[in-house]
A protein has these predicted regions:
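Amphipathic alpha-helical coiled-coil "transmission" helices that mediate dimerization
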Residues: 39-93
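Acidic/histidine metal-binding catalytic segments
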Residues: 165-166, 206-215, 257-263, 368-375, ...
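Alpha-helical scaffold within the catalytic cores of cyclic-nucleotide enzymes
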Residues: 143-159, 175-216, 220, 240-250
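Catalytic NTP-binding/metal-coordinating core of nucleotidyl cyclase/transferase enzymes
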Residues: 74, 81-93, 101-188
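Alpha-helical transmembrane segments and their helix-membrane boundary motifs
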Residues: 2-36, 44
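His-Asp-centered metal-binding catalytic motifs of divalent-metal-dependent phosphohydrolases/nucleases
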Residues: 355, 373-390, 394, 398, ...
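Cytosolic regulatory/linker segments at or just downstream of nucleotide-handling modules
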Residues: 223, 251-316, 479, 493-494, ...
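Divalent metal-dependent phosphate-bond-processing catalytic cores, especially two-metal-ion Mg2+/Mn2+ enzymes
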Residues: 293-295, 300-324, 340-370, 382, ...
């Protein structure tokens, strides 16, 4: 046993390092171990690299799969968006944009009432007889072409097409928009349709072909609007305004644009109109009508609004502004009519309307900014409000009314301050400090240089006499002579348009005072 154990010890690995051997014995062993380590390292590196390649392959494969899936999802989203856009486009063909947005967000559209919208009704004259002598296919195609042109014009002027009924075309302006701007757009569209029909007439006449005539009617009032149906939805408007628009159209003449008095009051500033009588309605009474002869020369370029004109800037300002001037004007005139004393024969609501018309004319020719134009008109509405409370030195009271009321109609603090300054500038003797003040001062006394001076002067005398501020016509003439002699206009427009007749009116008063002859 001792021998065997001793022999085993001599042959163990540990014996190699414990036994005393020569260096030549250890060197090969060390080399072998190093080689073994190197080989092991190389194998391990190859294993790691192989694993990396496998992982990189898997990652690349997964990345390509994800990228492919992403492309598929994006394509699906694109197709969904395309279909949604098509659906929206189809909806927009039958519904106004704000209604489409409400329908998409809420899933339904509430029935709403809209105040002071403008409805345009167009009808082809004698269509029944036209249909009798024409092929139905030709007739439908021609109607489609014509109504497509009407659609383009309606879209240009931001009108919402409501429907076509046979040969009748119905559109509306002002659903969710400003009254003044939508009424202007509605009448502008009517004039452009009139121009289109004239061009089609000339073209047909040159080929000895039949041409169509249309009647156009526009009315401004209140409507109820909503979406009808669930499967085949349709947007429609209802109310007496629609019926009146139809009556206005049917009482028009071919090639004419016929508008109601309510529309005329909104657009008369920008269009040349002529009165043409009235019609009786069952629920509304008599409605006065006006033909629109064209656009006011100040804004016209070959019969259409000049795109580079002041009017373009005014429309842009109105579209962005929150000011509701039409609502303000209606409120102010109604308030003055109710509150002003009936013996104010000069300073009544009619005077405010007169000055408003004058300030608009002067402002056009003086080319004030769109904002300045609005401020001037607002100041005119309030410049006689003070007469509600007291007769003398009432401008300050009018300014106080303006400060209280104007913010409710979209005027900001800076605009209200400017309007109050304009009201104060109308005090006599007038001392205007800027362009707007010069304009309102000239507008307030515009009648001095007009043909209706004598009748207005007579009303002023009767008013002053009723307030015991003048005793006789002779005294009144002396007051007028002194006042007119010291008065002078400030704007170029008034100087050129009113000075000559003002001088003649002054001479007449002087002559009458000298002869001591007065009209009753």
């Amino acid at each position: 046993m001792l021998y065997t154990a001793s022999s085993f010890k001599n042959f163990t690995f540990f014996h190699v390092f414990t036994s005393l051997k020569s260096p030549q014995y250890y060197f090969p062993l060390i080399i072998f171990c190093l080689l073994l380590l190197i080989v092991g390292y190389i194998i391990r590196v190859k294993q790691i690299n192989s694993t990396k390649r496998k992982l990189a392959f898997l990652v690349d494969k997964r990345t390509k799969t994800i990228s492919r899936q992403k492309d598929q999802i994006e394509e699906q989203n694109r197709l969904v968006k395309l279909e949604r856009d098509k659906s929206d486009e189809l909806l927009l063909n039958v519904l106004p944009q704000n209604i489409v947005e409400e329908l998409k967000s809420k899933g339904q559209v509430a029935i709403k009432s809209y105040q002071n919208v403008s409805v345009i009704f167009i009808d082809i004259v004698g269509f029944t007889k036209i249909a009798e002598r024409n092929n139905p296919t030709y007739l439908v195609n021609k109607l489609n072409d014509l109504f497509s042109e009407f659609d383009s014009i309606s879209e240009k002027y931001n009108l919402d097409k409501i429907k076509t009924i046979g040969d009748a075309y119905l559109a509306v302006g002002g659903i969710g928009g400003q009254v003044e701007l939508s009424s202007i757009n509605c009448v502008s569209a009517a004039l452009e349709i009139q121009l289109l029909m004239n061009k089609l007439k000339d073209f047909a006449s040159s080929k000895n072909e039949e041409y169509w005539e249309v009647r156009i009617g526009v009315h401004t009032g209140d409507v109820i609007a909503g979406v009808l149906g669930t499967k085949r939805i349709a947007y429609d408007i209802f109310g007496n305004t629609v019926n009146i628009a139809k009556r206005i159209e049917s009482n028009s003449e071919p090639w004419k644009v016929n508008i109601s008095e309510s529309t005329y009051k909104v657009v008369k500033t920008f269009f040349n109109c002529s009165s043409r009588g009235k019609i009786s309605t069952k629920n509304t009474g008599d409605i006065y009508m006006f033909y629109v002869n064209g656009i006011d020369d100040a804004f016209s370029s070959h019969g259409t609004f000049n795109s580079s004109s002041w009017f373009r800037d005014y429309k842009n300002f109105s579209a962005k502004s929150k000011i509701d001037f039409y609502g303000l004007e209606k409120y102010a005139i109604d308030f003055l009519t109710k509150k002003l004393a009936k013996n104010l024969l000069y300073h009544g609501p009619h005077h405010t309307k007169d000055v408003l018309e004058a300030v608009e004319k002067i402002a056009f020719n003086e080319r004030v900014t769109p904002e300045g134009f609005i401020l001037l008109r607002a100041a005119v509405l309030f410049h006689d409000f003070g007469y509600i409370d007291k007769y003398k030195e009432n401008e300050k009271i009018g300014a106080n009314y303006a400060r209280e009321i104007l913010p409710s109609y979209g005027f900001n603090t800076s605009q209200v301050t400017k309007i109050c300054d304009l009201i104060m500038s109308t005090r006599v003797p007038q001392k205007p400090n800027n362009q707007l003040e010069r304009i309102i001062c000239d507008a307030d006394l515009d009648y001095l240089g007009r043909k209706d001076f004598l009748s207005i002067s007579s009303n002023f005398y009767n008013e002053l006499k009723d307030y015991d501020l003048v005793e006789s016509k002779n005294e009144w003439d002396q007051i007028q002579i002194k006042f007119i002699q010291n008065h002078h206009f400030f704007t170029e427009y008034s100087i050129n348009k009113r000075s000559l007749l003002k001088k003649k009116n002054l001479e007449f008063i002087k002559d009458r005072a000298l002869k001591n002859k007065y009209t009753k």
